[in-house]
Amino acid sequence: MAVHTLESVSSFERGLGSACTVLRIDGDDLLGGSQEGVLACWSVDSGNERWRIETNGPISDLAMTDGRVYAAASSDLLALDANTGDIIWSRPLEGASDFVQVWEGVVWAASSVYEIEISDYTESTVWMFDSEGSLQEQWAFSERAWHFGLHEDGGVLLGLGRPRCGLLRIRSGEGASHRPLEGNSPVTVGACGSEGRFLIGHSDGRVCVVTDSVDEPSKERSSPVRAICSSGQAWFSGHESGEIVSSRGWVDTAPGAVESLAMGPSGSNGSGIWGSRWNGEASCVTVLEAADGSILLELGHCHQIRHLQSTDCNIALGDSSGRIHLIEEAFLSRRLKGIVEETDDSERRSQLMERLRRLRGV
């Protein structure tokens, strides 16, 4: 299969100036945050920049709701006007600001303290603010959270590293409730699946499908889980070894650690599993058929692609140089059709030239 360049199928390309650390698509808004603290918003339809601010970096997480953007930035939590980028309020947190989620006017944030002397995290805090930035409650614990998702009861669910590992459930007016998971392996990543399920990836390569009553672990694999996404009841995990594993039973293996996974346009009918890998020198983005893992499309890129963010018809990719590429389903289909036609024309020309050389006795 021919490997195309990422640029050749992108609807537009924009820049942040330093490594992209987070992406979000919300309606016609595409937001990107950088290592150095730039946060920018573009129109998905036109590509026009709507606003751009500079604050302390990195921008670690973003949440959008009710005309606002909430950003975990360096050691702060910011609330911004989604139309202008103006900062409405800012609150300092303890340590690094890691995650933010919003539900029905409640703003949840998580921060962590890293001690250089021992090269480990020593304390984390979950913060609960109202929409005006007033602190309502906070909870402290020893582990860093590697997943921070909204629970259907209005609280949050955290996936923990060592020492306790497992899950931590936090609700307003209650103490934090710890839930061990089978294997007791540190959580490395998580995602929210369908029907209230949480997908939790571990350092031993397992994926746990978690509901209120049960957790169903997959088998161990040779390397940690680095990325997870889902489609319906199926889940897909990306591993440090380069494997992309499906709960449907297939495995795709290629050189380079998997950096990110997302559902996105396939270039034909339906959607595919987008996975970015980095081999230390270049990135390869592979689009896989969800049913059987067959390769639909391969894209090459010279920088590390750490972040993928998608909606039904669009997918955004952010790289280590700060470039953001938006790929739209309709443009991708047209572009791939054009590439195929150009390739066919080139092959026909080559065949014709070969016939002429034979006729001339060359």
Segments predicted by a language model, with ranges:
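A short helix->beta-strand "capping" segment at the edge of beta-propeller domains
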Residues: 1-18, 45-48
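Beta-strand-rich domains and repeat architectures in extracellular enzymes and scaffolds
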Residues: 11-38, 53-61
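Repeated scaffold domains used in trafficking and secretory/extracellular systems
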Residues: 17-24, 57-65, 93-104, 141-153, ...
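Residue position within the beta-strands of beta-propeller blades
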Residues: 32, 71, 109-110, 158-159, ...
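WD40 beta-propeller blade core
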Residues: 40, 78-79, 127, 166-169, ...
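Short loop/turn segments that connect beta-strands within beta-propeller blades
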Residues: 43-47, 81-85, 129-134, 170-174, ...
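Short, solvent-exposed loop/turn segments at conserved positions within beta-propeller repeat blades
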Residues: 72, 116-123, 161-164, 278-283
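Blade-level signature of beta-propeller repeat domains, shared across WD40, Kelch, NHL, RCC1
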Residues: 301-362
